[in-house]
C-alpha cells in the first residue's frame, strides 16, 4: 500500500436496499446522501437493489423508481459522484440514459463472473456518454482466480475504467481475495483500476477489503452500518476506522460516518443486518446474498427452515437472477421432508 488516496464507494442506497426490500423513501435517500457527502465519500451508489429496472415481481417492487432515487441523491450532494448499477438482462441502455439524465455519472455494469461478454454494449455505451465505468464480476468466489482475471480482461477491453472482485455470497476468505487481485494484476493494464465489493456473511467483509488494498486495490465498496444484502457489506465506518489505524489516505470523516450509521441507517432495518444463523449460511454455502429475504419468505410459506433452503441453493450452485428457483427448491424440500444435505457447496 502506497500513499495513494483510496476511492471510497458507498453502496448504502443500492445494496442496502435489499435489507429493507427496496422501500427507501425519497426523504430517507436525501438524508443518507447528505450525510455521506458531508463525510467525504467519493461516490454514492443508488438504485433498486438489483440495479436499474430491478423493480419487478421477481426481485421485489421498489417504493420509488430508480430515476426518482437518483435525482434525490443528485439534488442532495455537493461533491460526491452519483453512481448506479446496471445488470445486463435487467437494465437496458435506455435505462442507463435515463439514469444519466437524472444525475448518475458513474455506472457499475454487473454480470455473473463467467458472463462478462454480456456487458459489452452497456460498457461501451456508458463510455460514449462520458460516464466513469466499472465492471462488476458477481459471485467471484465461484471460479478460479485465473478465469476471473480473464473475465476482467474482457471488461477492460470493452472500456471499463475499473474492474471489481465482487464477493456476492460473502464466501471468499482472505487468501481467495489475495489470489484474485494478484491474478488481475498479472493480466490487466496498470492504468485499469481494481475494486473490492465485500459481503460480511463470514464476518470477513472488512478483512477482505483490507487484503484487497494490500494487493493494490483502488476502490472499496462499503455501506453505513453494513446496510446490504445478507449480513450486509463491509461496514463503512468500521473499514474507515481500520484504514485510519493503518495510516491509509481515505478522505472520510470517521465520526460523521459513525453518527450516520447509528442515527440514520440502523433504525431503518426491519431485520437486523448482522451475521446470524441465516446470513452465515449464505457465506458458508456460497449463496447470492440477496436471496436471503426471498428464502425467508419461502421458508415461512412452506414450513421450512431458511438455512435448509439456502444450503440447497448453494448445493445447486444457483446464481443471481435465479430468484424464481427459491420457491422450486422450497417445494422440493417440502416434498422430501426437509433438508437434503447441510454440506457446503
Swiss-Prot record:
SUPFAM superfamilies: Aldolase, post-HMGL domain-like. InterPro entries: 2-IPM_HCS-like, 4OH_2_O-val_aldolase, Aldolase_TIM, DmpG_comm, DRE_TIM_HOA, PYR_CT. Its EC number is 4.1.3.39. Residues 6-258 form the Pyruvate carboxyltransferase domain. GO terms for biological process: catabolic process; L-leucine biosynthetic process. The active site is at residue 18. Mn(2+) binds at residues 15, 197, 199. It catalyses: (S)-4-hydroxy-2-oxopentanoate = acetaldehyde + pyruvate. The keyword DNA damage does not apply. The keyword Metal-binding applies. One of its GO terms (molecular function) is 2-isopropylmalate synthase activity. The record marks 14 as: Transition state stabilizer. Substrate binds at residues 14-15, 168, 197, 288. Coiled coil: none annotated. Pfam families: DmpG_comm, HMGL-like. It comes from the Bacteria. Keywords: Aromatic hydrocarbons catabolism, Lyase, Manganese, Metal-binding, Plasmid. HAMAP family: HOA. Belongs to the 4-hydroxy-2-oxovalerate aldolase family. This is 4-hydroxy-2-oxovalerate aldolase 2. It comes from Cupriavidus metallidurans (strain ATCC 43123 / DSM 2839 / NBRC 102507 / CH34).
Amino acid at each position: 500500500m502506497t500513499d495513494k488516496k483510496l476511492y471510497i464507494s458507498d453502496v448504502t442506497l443500492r445494496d442496502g436496499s435489499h435489507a429493507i426490500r427496496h422501500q427507501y423513501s425519497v426523504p430517507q435517500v436525501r438524508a443518507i446522501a447528505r450525510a455521506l457527502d458531508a463525510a467525504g465519500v467519493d461516490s454514492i451508489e443508488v438504485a433498486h437493489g438489483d440495479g436499474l429496472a430491478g423493480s419487478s415481481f421477481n426481485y421485489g417492487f421498489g417504493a420509488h423508481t430508480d430515476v426518482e432515487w437518483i435525482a434525490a441523491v443528485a439534488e442532495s450532494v455537493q461533491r460526491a459522484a452519483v453512481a448506479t448499477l446496471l445488470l445486463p438482462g435487467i437494465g437496458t441502455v435506455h435505462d442507463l440514459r435515463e439514469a444519466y439524465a437524472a444525475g448518475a455519472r458513474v455506472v457499475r455494469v454487473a454480470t455473473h463472473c463467467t458472463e462478462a461478454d454480456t456487458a459489452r454494449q452497456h460498457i461501451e455505451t456508458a463510455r460514449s456518454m462520458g460516464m466513469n465505468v466499472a465492471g462488476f464480476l458477481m459471485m467471484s468466489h465461484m471460479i478460479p482466480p485465473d478465469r476471473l482475471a480473464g473475465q476482467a480482461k474482457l471488461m477492460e477491453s470493452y472500456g471499463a475504467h475499473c474492474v471489481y472482485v465482487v464477493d456476492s455470497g460473502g464466501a471468499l476468505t482472505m487468501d481467495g481475495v489475495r489470489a484474485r487481485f494478484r491474478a488481475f494484476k498479472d493480466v490487466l493494464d496498470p492504468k485499469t483500476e481494481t475494486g473490492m465489493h465485500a459481503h460480511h456473511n463470514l464476518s470477513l467483509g472488512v478483512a477482505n477489503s483490507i487484503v484487497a488494498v494490500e494487493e493494490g486495490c483502488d476502490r472499496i465498496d462499503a455501506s453505513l452500518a453494513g446496510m446490504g444484502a445478507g449480513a450486509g457489506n463491509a461496514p463503512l465506518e468500521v473499514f474507515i476506522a481500520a484504514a485510519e489505524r493503518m495510516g491509509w489516505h481515505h478522505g472520510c470523516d470517521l465520526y460523521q460516518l459513525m453518527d450516520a450509521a447509528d442515527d440514520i441507517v440502523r433504525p431503518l432495518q426491519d431485520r437486523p443486518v448482522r451475521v446470524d444463523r441465516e446470513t452465515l449460511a449464505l457465506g458458508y454455502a456460497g449463496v447470492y446474498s440477496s436471496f436471503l429475504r426471498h428464502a425467508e419468505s419461502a421458508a415461512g410459506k412452506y414450513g421450512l427452515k431458511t438455512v435448509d433452503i439456502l444450503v440447497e441453493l448453494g448445493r445447486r450452485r444457483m446464481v443471481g437472477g435465479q430468484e424464481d428457483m427459491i420457491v422450486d427448491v422450497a417445494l422440493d424440500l417440502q416434498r422430501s421432508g426437509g433438508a437434503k444435505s447441510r454440506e457446503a457447496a
